[in-house]
């Protein structure tokens, strides 16, 4: 569980870097740190993710949003994974596993300590950072961001997704890093506890 949470953290670092929130005014440092975090998380491409993530912010919760689906949670998650995990990621991860096995011999450590936590982290990020905040519901969204926030207290908010459940606040202030989202008031767009 701890490794899954740390894997979520790697993605959150990359996400904040996409918004220039790691080192304000230093896009090169943000890109470098974000690229490294994405590579360690699951072999993802910075270029591919930043383009899709900015499209998500421009078109949140609409058919033009690469993170959005009108299906149920399982089909939405499958679409979500297909959007971000392609042949490049497959070859980066596969090559890493082969290289690791050649250097250290066949072991299950890379599965236990990297692959499984990354897969579980993708599910956690999807549930708390995409599905809960952006799913169509009987309550209307508060504004064009088509995002809601969870009402978890700070400890649970940190554990679920590094305060990324404060998703409406994130869409209102994307330049704020994750550690400042917990201190952002929740003006509207609240979600009940799931």
Predicted regions and their residues:
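Hydrophobic transmembrane alpha-helical segments that form the core helix bundle
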Residues: 1-5, 60-158, 162
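Alpha-helical transmembrane segments of polytopic integral membrane proteins
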Residues: 10-14, 46, 125
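Long, highly hydrophobic alpha-helical transmembrane signal-anchor segments
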Residues: 1-31, 93-94
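Membrane-spanning helices that line or support transport/gating and their immediate boundary helices
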Residues: 13-20, 52-55, 127, 131
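Residue-level micro-sites within transmembrane alpha helices that shape
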Residues: 14-15, 116, 133, 169
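Structural signature of transmembrane alpha-helix termini at the membrane-water interface
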Residues: 9, 21, 40, 47, ...
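Membrane-proximal soluble regions of multi-pass membrane proteins
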Residues: 24-76, 135-194
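Hydrophobic alpha-helical membrane-associated segments
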Residues: 5-10, 37, 41, 120
């Amino acid at each position: 569980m701890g490794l899954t949470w740390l894997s979520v953290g790697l993605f959150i670092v990359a996400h904040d870097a996409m918004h220039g929130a790691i080192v304000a005014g230093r896009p090169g440092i943000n890109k470098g740190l974000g690229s490294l975090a994405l590579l360690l998380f699951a072999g993802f491409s910075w270029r591919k993710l930043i383009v899709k993530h900015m499209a998500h912010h421009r078109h949140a919760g609409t058919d033009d949003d690469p993170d959005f689906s009108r299906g149920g949670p399982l089909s939405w998650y499958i679409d979500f994974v297909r959007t971000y995990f392609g042949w490049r990621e497959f070859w980066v991860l596969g090559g890493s596993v082969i290289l690791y096995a050649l250097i250290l011999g066949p072991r299950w450590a890379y599965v236990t300590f990297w692959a499984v936590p990354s897969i579980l982290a993708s599910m956690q990020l999807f549930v708390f950072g995409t599905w809960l905040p952006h799913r169509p519901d009987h309550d209307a969204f508060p504004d064009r961001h088509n995002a809601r926030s969870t009402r978890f207290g700070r400890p649970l908010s940190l554990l679920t997704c590094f305060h990324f459940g404060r998703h409406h606040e994130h869409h209102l202030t994307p330049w704020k890093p994750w550690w400042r989202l917990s201190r952002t008031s929740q003006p509207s767009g609240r979600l009940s506890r799931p």
